[in-house]
């Protein structure tokens, strides 16, 4: 999968899942590879994300993302928690941090046809 941030393009092996008919990217896996920090607190129902000088808190119980500046963005279906790991839609990742991802480069093995 290719990831672009501020003109730099990275070719990364990212963990993804499919949920709600869409692809979601493991934030922990992505941030480890590009220098961000992700902290998920299941008890507090919050996810702290730090990258590129930006800090967002995803308040899962309230359904909003809050920036240090106080800006709020509704989460909608942008975040999925699976086995205590946080996955975010590529569109939401772009909205929060300006990170563009190309999920079309993800290899998907087609099922054999039964003709």
List each language-model region with its residue ranges.
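Primary recognition of N-terminal secretory signal peptides and signal-anchoring hydrophobic helices
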Residues: 1-115
């Amino acid at each position: 999968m290719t990831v672009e941030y501020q003109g730099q393009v990275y070719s990364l092996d990212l963990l993804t899942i499919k949920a709600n008919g869409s692809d979601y990217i493991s934030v922990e896996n992505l941030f480890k590879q590009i220098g961000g920090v992700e902290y998920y607190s299941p008890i507090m129902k919050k996810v702290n994300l730090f990258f590129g000088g930006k800090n967002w808190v995803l308040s899962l119980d309230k359904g909003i993302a809050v920036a240090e500046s106080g800006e709020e963005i509704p989460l909608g279906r942008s975040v999925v928690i699976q086995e205590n790991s946080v996955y975010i839609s590529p569109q939401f990742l772009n909205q929060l941090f300006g990170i563009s991802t190309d999920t079309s480069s993800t290899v998907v093995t087609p099922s054999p046809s039964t003709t």
